[in-house]
Amino acid sequence: MAKLKFQNHTFTLEPYESVLDCLLRNAQTIPYACKAGTCQACLIRTIACEATAESKKWIKNALQDKGYTLACQWLPEQDVHAALPTIEEFSVAVLISELVMLNKSVMRVKLDVKDPAEMFHYRPGQYLSLINPDGIIRSYSIANSYEKDQCIELHIANTEHGIFTQWLFKSAVVGMKIHIRGPSGTCFYNDAIEKDQVLVMAGTGTGLAPLYGIARDALTHGHSGPITFYHGGRSDAHLYYREQLLALQHEFPLFDYRPCTIDASSDPAVLTGRLEQIVEAQLDSSHLQKMRFFLCGAPTFVFDMRKRIYLKGARADNIICDPFTERNVTPT
């Protein structure tokens, strides 16, 4: 059977076993999350060997050229040698410039890049990985354009058992240095989108962040078709960024912001009901095939919403999804 050399240790790979599973089975320290190639937390560097094409296809060509691959997707059939990359090898140093609560559980985090020359290009709506001083990694969607704002904006929800968020909400301070890696994800405004295409955006919780970034990006690029923006929460207290979205609606008449809550609201502008049911009920079936959808947030919502609009007549390739699933990176 094939051997895996890692951090001065040698392990035997089981048949059809990934490098990640082998390392975890042998109690080695490596960050990981989804085990599906999406989060890219388990990035490793090959040494004097070649990783499989399948394990490399998930990452950018620039990283492939430097010998990186994903441990979760690499199933070696011969002896291999790998190592964890250092922070300096694959990340950009940033400073926390703002920590502001947007509601009781969501914080806006702004990051300044220490050396703008090192900053990578991204599109609003993609996500990047944050690496805190303890080496814990977590991925978050990007809510803005770095080129326009000269900072990176993230919206982060506090989770009771989240190692990273507990650090962020309790210990992080403005001026602290952390690192970022990215970008990843395909949920963004594509330049190939027809400028007059009808766009429907729907998200729950901090699913607002990528959608807000995508909407602004579309409008900045001269999108002239209607954009309907749904944001859902359990109650009024779970909604946020209402002033910003109303301002966007005032500036761009074709942008239509529709807040939704499960609990009844005292605000007549807020729609009451489950977000997926509200969106489905308001869609015009005769035009669904020409619409493009962006769905972000809780996986249960994203998958249900995708199924509903597809069965109603939307084209599968016009439904762009970012379910916030399996992004919690586990430090071992």
Predicted stretch roles:
Residues 1-71, 80, 226, 230-332:
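Reductase modules of NAD(P)H-dependent flavoproteins
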Residues 68-89, 177-180:
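Short, structured interface segments
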Residues 4, 82-85, 128-133, 176-182:
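Short conserved beta-strand and strand-loop elements enriched in small hydrophobics
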Residues 212-220:
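Histidine-anchored nucleotide/phosphate-binding helix
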Residues 220-226:
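Conserved S-adenosyl-L-methionine
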